[in-house]
Amino acid sequence: MKTIIALSYIFCLALGQDLPGNDNSTATLCLGHHAVPNGTLVKTITDDQIEVTNATELVQSSSTGKICNNPHRILDGIDCTLIDALLGDPHCDVFQKETWDLFVERSKAFSNCYPYDVPDYASLRSLVASSGTLEFITEGFTWTGVTQNGGSIACKRGPDSGFFSRLNWLTKSESTYPVLNVTMPNNDNFDKLYIWGIHHPSTNQEQTSLYVQASGRVTVSTRRSQQTIIPNIGSRPWVRGLSSRISIYWTIVKPGDVLVINSNGNLIAPRGYFKMRTGKSSIMRSDAPIDTCISECITPNGSIPNDKPFQNVNKITYGACPKYVKQNTLKLATGMRNVPEKQTRGLFGAIAGFIENGWEGMIDGWYGFRHQNSEGTGQAADLKSTQAAIDQINGKLNRVIEKTNEKFHQIEKEFSEVEGRIQDLEKYVEDTKIDLWSYNAELLVALENQHTIDLTDSEMNKLFEKTRRQLRENAEDMGNGCFKIYHKCDNACIESIRNGTYDHDVYRDEALNNRFQIKGVELKSGYKDWILWISFAISCFLLCVVLLGFIMWTCQRGNIRCNICI
């Protein structure tokens, strides 16, 4: 029995002994990539969540809270609407001749003149806003037989009764109001905008006291259009002490065309025209303060940076702005797939390369080498493969911004109650566009992320194959991203492998000799398993033989009696 125990002990020592080649005659070289303890989750085409070492947020979700006055010219409407400034409301006289890129209307704006309405308010507001100017040219209209410059206590200019400065209220002269027929040709080479109106008295008595006739009529024509308006006499809700109203209309006269005005009463006549310009100017409702700063993109919430391709601050924008999307976040991968390092390994406790996990602490590159040789252990980055990956990734964000950032503005849409169907259709179209852009944005980012991860994986594989081609039969692929080098390889040798100057032939004979010696005695884990199973089987067989012999011996001595019955 003692002999068997001794042999078993010797056998176990033989199995557990250090293998030849784990001394200074071999080295280990592993290839790996950068990793971080806590990566960032991004979405790809194939995965909803995949962890990468670094990612950039693509959605701007906050504003500065203020509107920057540079590089866009911002005109603060203060307490005036654009239409009030256009008509010449007394408290808006400061805006005469003003120009702007963006006119900012405030919620506190109010009218302080004769009560009026504009049947096509949204179109007029948008037209004037895009022109970017309130430049007004007075013309010499001749109104014979009527009283001009009518005014009202509801529209005081200083202590006196007044009226809109750009309009001329015509009333009867003595007891007559003749038929007016005035023409005004456009001999210039630009469009002219004429603002005019019609007065709706609250009573028949007011109608005749102002215009003599029981009902007036206003017709304004050009070669391209004609509008005939008849006043609607009747009481309306009281505003600033008045129950009568004025309706404002507008006509554009092209170069070479003629403006014709015909009326027998109730006419609010133009005093001249606004010079129309084509441009990128616009208007926005906002209560954000205007500050001295620089920003290309403006929203009602305030200016926002345009260094991201998407934003979800506001659908209404002006300038070079990111596209509005519904998502609160879209992350673009700007690093590789993250596989955190298994901390229990130590540097070379159980050496492993990129196939098993990444390496934390690689601050000078994305890809690199770790080695273990007779001089110790070390690590170095591979700058060439790192730079190749970075160069291809760096342009991604700029390309996405170029695809989405355009010089455009999304203005507010306004519709009257009778245009409810148009408003519903417009809202549906806008919502559909936003849904489409949101889907496209998510798809675009997922595609770019997939490409980034595939790209960085490819660079790792290229570096591994490059190293394999250098080492050839001088080393063995260990299957985990590492090579077992079968010759003595000091730090200079390791450096030659990293920089591509390794000479395979110099070490060939030594590597073949060491490989032969090691392979001759090396027991792989598979052979150990076979030996253990064979040993177990032999032990069981010997135990059975001993037991059977003991039974036969006792039977011969008569100590055991065995009866076999059939």
Swiss-Prot record:
Residues 552-566 are cytoplasmic. Residues 1-16 form the signal peptide. Residues 17-530 are extracellular. GO terms for cellular component: host cell plasma membrane; membrane; viral envelope; virion membrane. Pfam families: Hemagglutinin. Disulfide bonds join 30-482, 68-293, 80-92, 113-155, 297-321, 489-493. It is found in: Virion membrane; Host apical cell membrane. The record marks 345-346 as: Cleavage. It comes from the Viruses. A lipid is attached at residues 555, 562, 565 (S-palmitoyl cysteine). One of its GO terms (molecular function) is host cell surface receptor binding. Glycans are attached at residues 24, 38, 54, 181, 301, 499. Its main location: virion. One of its GO terms (biological process) is fusion of virus membrane with host plasma membrane. InterPro entries: Capsid_hemagglutn, Hemagglutn_HA1_a/b_dom_sf, Hemagglutn_influenz_A, Hemagglutn_influenz_A/B. Belongs to the influenza viruses hemagglutinin family. Homotrimer of disulfide-linked HA1-HA2. Binds to sialic acid-containing receptors on the cell surface, bringing about the attachment of the virus particle to the cell. This attachment induces virion internalization of about two third of the virus particles through clathrin-dependent endocytosis and about one third through a clathrin- and caveolin-independent pathway. Plays a major role in the determination of host range restriction and virulence. Class I viral fusion protein. This is Hemagglutinin. It comes from Influenza A virus (strain A/X-31 H3N2).
